[in-house]
Curated annotation (Swiss-Prot):
Keyword Ribonucleoprotein: yes
NCBIfam families (UniProt xref): PRK00504.1, PRK00595.1, rpmG_bact
MF terms (GO), sorted A to Z: structural constituent of ribosome
Record gene name: rpmG
Record family assignment: Belongs to the bacterial ribosomal protein bL33 family.
Matching InterPro entries: Ribosomal_bL33 (IPR001705), Ribosomal_bL33_CS (IPR018264), Ribosomal_bL33_sf (IPR038584), Ribosomal_zn-bd (IPR011332)
PROSITE patterns referenced in this protein's UniProt entry, alphabetically: RIBOSOMAL_L33 (PS00582)
Entry keyword set: Ribonucleoprotein, Ribosomal protein
Annotated GO CC locations: cytoplasm; ribonucleoprotein complex; ribosome
HAMAP family xrefs: Ribosomal_bL33 (MF_00294)
GO BP terms, alphabetized: translation
Protein's recorded name: Large ribosomal subunit protein bL33
Length: 59
């Protein structure tokens, strides 16, 4: 059986590079545990260095 589609606690998000605006990563986030937006230092392949990536919606 497949997963239920609806408003669960876990949502799929994308991580967007602050310097280039490119969506490099996708991950999940539990809304009950983390209310604020996710901000992580991740590797940006276009710039070839670690940059700040912020949470964004998946289109």
């Amino acid at each position: 059986m497949g997963k239920k589609k609806g408003k669960g606690a876990v949502e799929l998000i994308s991580l967007i590079c602050e310097e280039t605006g490119i969506r490099n990563y996708t991950t999940t986030k539990n809304r009950r545990n983390k209310q604020e937006k996710l901000e992580l230092m991740k590797y940006c392949p276009k710039l070839r260095k670690h940059t700040l990536h912020k949470e964004g919606k998946i289109k």
